[in-house]
Amino acid sequence: MASSSSVPASSTPSKKPRDKIADWFRQALLKKPKKMPISQESHLYDGSQTATQDGLSPSSCSSPPSHSSPESRSSPSSCSSGMSPTSPPTHVDSSSSSSGRWSKDYDVCVCHSEEDLEAAQELVSYLEGSQASLRCFLQLRDAAPGGAIVSELCQALSRSHCRALLITPGFLRDPWCKYQMLQALTEAPASEGCTIPLLSGLSRAAYPPELRFMYYVDGRGKDGGFYQVKEAVIHYLETLS
């Protein structure tokens, strides 16, 4: 009986040191400051460097300010310039510098007789004053002084995308007009929309046989057919872009 009563007495003092040790470790852990793992810090630091190299602003990076590199603390203006688009707009019209329109000096050469100079000037004024700002060649205004007539006529055609033929009774009587008409057909036999006959003061029967394979603009309208000539020139220029 004496031996059985001695067992509780010996086990009681052995539990108290273990409880004290457990309490000491618990207090030590509670007092230990929390610290971010090294692997996580290095991961965030690498992320801030990657964002800086890609041109992103510091506010878009996931790293806190204390872990960001000096290079990532750039000014807002430098960040916005890094994100600005460098490619030009995709939209291109007939007036753009990338258009084939600028491969020649003029958009249209107005061919007319001497007695139709006033009508030719009105047509040129209409085309140049339009929203498209078409570049016109008018012989009396744009031909080089002292230049040979044949050379000037040929150069005017070769330096222009389109040819507007102001076909009138005076045009049919002028040998230079007929020469210019035949030269225009030689450079573009199939026309392809670049030769635009404007019939004015003539019947359909008087239409030159050399041009009867292509449609002409009727100049008997209220605007003298100027609008149709302008639209034909613009349509041809759009095929060049």
Curated annotation (Swiss-Prot):
Subcellular location: Cytoplasm; Cell membrane; Membrane
A single MF term (Gene Ontology): identical protein binding
Residue spans of biased composition, Polar residues class: 39-56
Example of a GO cellular component annotation carried by this entry: plasma membrane
Database matches in Gene3D superfamilies: Toll/interleukin-1 receptor homology (TIR) domain (3.40.50.10140)
Biased composition (Low complexity): 1-14, 57-99
A UniProt-annotated Pfam family: TIR_2
PROSITE patterns according to UniProt: TIR (PS50104)
Swiss-Prot/TrEMBL keywords: Cell membrane, Cytoplasm, Disulfide bond, Immunity, Inflammatory response, Innate immunity, Membrane, Phosphoprotein, Ubl conjugation
UniProt domain TIR: residue ranges: 104-233
Function description: Adapter involved in the TLR2, TLR4 and RAGE signaling pathways in the innate immune response. Acts via IRAK2 and TRAF-6, leading to the activation of NF-kappa-B, MAPK1, MAPK3 and JNK, and resulting in cytokine secretion and the inflammatory response. Positively regulates the production of TNF-alpha and interleukin-6.
PANTHER family: TIRAP, TOLL_INTERLEUKIN-1 RECEPTOR DOMAIN-CONTAINING ADAPTER PROTEIN
Protein name, as recorded: Toll/interleukin-1 receptor domain-containing adapter protein
Natural source organism: Mus musculus
Lineage: Eukaryota, Metazoa, Chordata, Craniata, Vertebrata
Gene name linked to the record: Tirap
